[in-house]
């Protein structure tokens, strides 16, 4: 068995709590509930995609999207929405569902112009204060692989409700050092899987938000 394919969310889940990760992703004896916030986020992403891709008007419910999406729409370049990318274990591009896929990610929006690109990830969180740019980093590095002509990426986490953007610039020549960090993170998951050791990592989320009822740190115990 392989822990691959992995993604940013998979890494974050493991780092948050290996035991919970095991039950959700390996044993699969528990599932996270599909919350109203998740459904809202999915709908917002679809509205954004339809606007950028097809020019479909934004519903009144999502009127706050008009400003940021119009700004993105005005940018010159080839606009690609909800792009599914895969990489094999040699970091060569492959299909999202290919048998040899090692890493997977979906970019909300990529705008390509000559040797530069913008990589955008939409967020519906009400605050950008604790933004994690790891997802941006992985999307940028995968974009370099899938579009080898690109040398520089301006990336951003776009908090559409808060009207804030967390920005970062990535250059192709720096990709190697960035990948090393993610190889290390992935190796920790590999070791846990090989040794079948999935220790709980207690936090303030355990008692009210964890679905793994059998864990001693769960609030039901």
Give the residues covered by each predicted segment:
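RecB-family 4Fe-4S metal-dependent nuclease core
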Residues: 1-221
């Amino acid at each position: 068995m392989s822990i691959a394919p992995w993604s940013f969310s998979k890494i974050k889940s493991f780092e948050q709590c290996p035991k919970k990760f095991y039950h959700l992703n390996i044993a699969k004896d528990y599932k996270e509930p599909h919350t109203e916030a998740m459904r809202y986020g999915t709908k917002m992403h679809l509205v954004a995609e339809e606007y950028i891709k097809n020019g479909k008007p934004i519903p009144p419910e999502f009127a706050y999207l008009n400003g940021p999406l119009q700004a993105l729409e005005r940018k010159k370049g080839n606009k690609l929405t909800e792009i599914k990318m895969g990489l094999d274990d040699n970091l060569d591009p492959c299909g999202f569902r290919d048998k040899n896929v090692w890493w997977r990610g979906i970019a909300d929006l990529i705008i390509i112009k000559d040797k530069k690109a913008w990589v955008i990830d939409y967020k519906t969180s009400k605050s950008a204060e604790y933004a994690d740019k790891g997802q941006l980093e992985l999307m940028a590095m995968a974009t370099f692989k899938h579009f080898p002509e690109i040398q520089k990426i301006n990336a951003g986490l776009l908090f559409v409700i808060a009207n804030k953007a967390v920005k970062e610039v990535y250059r192709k020549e720096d990709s190697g050092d960035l990948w090393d960090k993610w190889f290390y993170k992935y190796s920790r998951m590999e070791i846990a899987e090989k040794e079948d050791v999935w220790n709980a990592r207690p936090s303030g989320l355990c008692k009210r938000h964890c679905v793994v009822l059998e864990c001693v740190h769960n609030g039901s115990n």
